[in-house]
């Protein structure tokens, strides 16, 4: 079996190609089984990618469908889960130099 295409669109096109071959019915039983396995793997990978995209979009939107602004530096997200402890850089004051 060849390596799977990388992009979502390439994987989807390959899955559509497999489905078409299986629907045509002119494939041997053994080849059908292999195509089915490959198709299921692609289907699961695609479903995972869609779930990740949906989660990402849901995290960016509030309950009213409004887009959240990008996270600012110093928040818990950009610090790997560590909250900003109130540190203020001396370079932000402007009167260092």
UniProtKB/Swiss-Prot annotation:
List the Pfam families. Answer: Exonuc_VII_S
Q: What does this protein do?
A: Bidirectionally degrades single-stranded DNA into large acid-insoluble oligonucleotides, which are then degraded further into small acid-soluble oligonucleotides.
In terms of superkingdom, the source organism counts as Bacteria
User: Where is composition skewed (Polar residues) in this entry?
Assistant: 77-88
Record key words, sorted: Cytoplasm, Exonuclease, Hydrolase, Nuclease
Identify this protein by name.
Exodeoxyribonuclease 7 small subunit
Where does it mainly reside? cytoplasm
Does this UniProt record's set of keywords contain Secreted?
no
Subcellular location(s) per record: Cytoplasm
What PANTHER family does UniProt report for this protein, alphabetically? EXODEOXYRIBONUCLEASE 7 SMALL SUBUNIT
Q: Which Gene3D superfamilies does this entry report, sorted A to Z?
A: Exonuclease VII, small subunit
Q: Which GO terms describe its cellular component?
A: cytosol; exodeoxyribonuclease VII complex
A GO molecular-function descriptor:
exodeoxyribonuclease VII activity
* Coiled-coil blocks: none
Q: What is its EC number?
A: 3.1.11.6
- Keyword flag Hydrolase: yes
